[in-house]
């Protein structure tokens, strides 16, 4: 996780569980992230991550991808808000010709207790930055979600997302289980 107060690296293993298909390995991503140190006391948190990953063709027409994700967040009392205006690019697959695509994400949550937070998450994929896809072809999902902070090292996030457009999966569940390593 954190090599310094301003640099961390995440590694993701993606899986899929479909009715009748069992559990499949989808792919892996690595995400180095640089942050403005908290000791600088900026009014908002600011960081940027670069995520490079592989997804099997059975799960994505674009098997090798790159994402640049600025992360702007703020904690006010028990409330948390984050905006991640991500830019994605395919290196291999049908989306290569699209160039960079805009994929905004938002999160708003409330700490019910020091260990339990709940809120809404939004994930969008609007299309190429040179001209967004028609609304019906965009991917837009809203997830009621819960965060469980078991300890400073362990985190858990779960949500059930509803697709808001024809181009989106209509119902999807997501889960993140994270462990922070110190080096």
Model-derived features: positions:
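Transmembrane beta-barrel domains of Gram-negative outer membranes and organellar outer membranes
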Residues: 1-183
């Amino acid at each position: 996780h954190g090599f310094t107060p301003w640099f961390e690296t995440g590694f993701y293993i993606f899986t899929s569980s479909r009715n009748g298909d069992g559990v499949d390995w989808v792919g892996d991503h690595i995400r180095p992230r640089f942050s403005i140190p908290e000791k600088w006391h900026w009014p908002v948190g600011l960081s940027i991550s670069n995520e490079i990953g592989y997804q099997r063709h059975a799960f994505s027409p674009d098997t090798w991808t790159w994402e640049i994700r600025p992360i702007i967040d703020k904690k006010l009392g028990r409330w948390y808000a984050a905006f991640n205006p991500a830019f994605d690019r395919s290196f291999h697959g049908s989306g290569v010709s699209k160039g960079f695509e805009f994929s905004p994400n938002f999160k708003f949550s409330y700490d019910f207790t020091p260990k339990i937070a709940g809120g809404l998450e939004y994930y969008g994929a609007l299309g190429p930055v040179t001209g967004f896809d028609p609304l019906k072809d965009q991917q837009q999902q809203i997830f009621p979600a819960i965060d469980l902070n078991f300890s400073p090292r362990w985190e858990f996030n779960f949500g059930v997302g509803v697709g808001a457009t024809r181009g989106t999966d209509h119902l999807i569940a997501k889960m993140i289980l994270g462990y922070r390593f110190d080096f």
